[in-house]
Amino acid sequence: MAYQVLLICLVSTIVFAYILWRKQSKKNLPPSPKALPIIGHLHLVSPIPHQDFYKLSTRHGPIMQLFLGSVPCVVASTAEAAKEFLKTHEINFSNRPGQNVAVKGLAYDSQDFLFAFAPFGPYWKFMKKLCMSELLSGRMMDQFLPVRQQETKRFISRVFRKGVAGEAVDFGDELMTLSNNIVSRMTLSQKTSENDNQAEEMKKLVSNIAELMGKFNVSDFIWYLKPFDLQGFNRKIKETRDRFDVVVDGIIKQRQEERRKNKETGTAKQFKDMLDVLLDMHEDENAEIKLDKKNIKAFIMDIFVAGTDTSAVSIEWAMAELINNPDVLEKARQEIDAVVGKSRMVEESDIANLPYLQAIVRETLRLHPGGPLVVRESSKSAVVCGYDIPAKTRLFVNVWAIGRDPNHWEKPFEFRPERFIRDGQNQLDVRGQHYHFIPFGSGRRTCPGASLAWQVVPVNLAIIIQCFQWKLVGGNGKVDMEEKSGITLPRANPIICVPVPRINPFPTI
């Protein structure tokens, strides 16, 4: 019986593909490699798709069409093409694709619950407004400055103690702890590290969720394979979501009990964090958008993945580049010593006076963008750059490839922060206004966490440079630059270093 069902599905797919081919052969479609029956171009795409898209674009042009299984796709690989899709045709390409098995499973069987993946509509607009006003506005960034400072000091103190003892550290793991604690305190008013087991679990969960969301799942593209779960995704998704539920359900339950007691005693909470705001909406019958527990948990998942993984990975890539380019590292250290000195640690207010450090961060984001692919979907058919783009076409803007385009970047594969400095000032904003440099995307669906990343990444990178020399364990003094799959751009291998204290910001240690 299963064989008969599979045979019917295969025949149906071939017939559908033929009808689609006949229909589209009359249109002016983008150039495309030769496709295979049923799988289309899936055989050309590895688990790290942005690299394969880049290689294909060198042969087929800046805008090319691919069929990933039964899903029609278009890949934009230059700044000019990105601008057409993300600015000229922004409204038509404001939706996210809806077939992602991992996202749907992690988001409690509704992709709409995850703000980052929700369709462009009332819920997405409401959640973005909530995120920007209650968590990431300038007012909230200022209010949470002491939190970021405290967590940075704890991070440096922890690494400093290991350095004094001559212990090696997993650089990325330490950064994940730092980012996790910052996001947790901003969102939940508590550190995940207040409970060591919970901290370790949350770090693993954030990494697992980011990896699952970004993995290339063949079932997303060949619909009749979903019941078979050939890659074992469903089991991993359920296991990860169940573990996430255990942690977050406990936090929500504890907060609800605190709120109940405060209400009984008439005690007013001095400051409401993001969880309080979400629970207020959950309890308010007249709220503009009614949030249930699944909405709240999905939003917390969104914030942790976007706020934790992106910042930690960006700092880790920056240090990998600096270790491999010691002249750049030394120049950055000299700038910090000249501007800040050695008697105190760098603060966020110093960053404006450290143009070379800012250039290092920008150059890191050029080569290692937090999101290597901007993924959208067309709401209706359109003509872009002279090509017919049908409705429901999945768009991949290859940010990773755009950062390596020799038409915009001289010697694009070299790490050269100087390219961002002109007349002593940094050039190019990171928020998507310059289409050859869009590390956080562009337009109304620009990553909302860009403002937090720009607060967290430069200052912590500066302090790491200022306080320590870094002695690489193994690797012949060089860090490998291999990537692995994920929704962000994680490193394939950890950076293991011995932090050699250079200045002592903690005289009691």
From Swiss-Prot:
Its cofactor is heme. PROSITE patterns: CYTOCHROME_P450. Optimum temperature is 30 degrees Celsius. Induction: Up-regulated by methyl jasmonate, elicitor treatments and elicitor peptides GmSubPep, GmPEP890 and GmPEP914. GO terms for cellular component: membrane. It comes from the Eukaryota. Transmembrane segments: none annotated. Its EC number is 1.14.14.93. One of its GO terms (biological process) is defense response. Keywords: Heme, Iron, Membrane, Metal-binding, Monooxygenase, Oxidoreductase, Plant defense. It catalyses: (6aR,11aR)-3,9-dihydroxypterocarpan + reduced [NADPH--hemoprotein reductase] + O2 = (6aS,11aS)-3,6a,9-trihydroxypterocarpan + oxidized [NADPH--hemoprotein reductase] + H2O + H(+). It is found in: Membrane. Optimum pH is 7.4. Heme binds at C447. GO terms for molecular function: 3,9-dihydroxypterocarpan 6a-monooxygenase activity; heme binding; iron ion binding; oxidoreductase activity, acting on paired donors, with incorporation or reduction of molecular oxygen, NAD(P)H as one donor, and incorporation of one atom of oxygen. Pfam families: p450 (PF00067). This is 3,9-dihydroxypterocarpan 6A-monooxygenase.
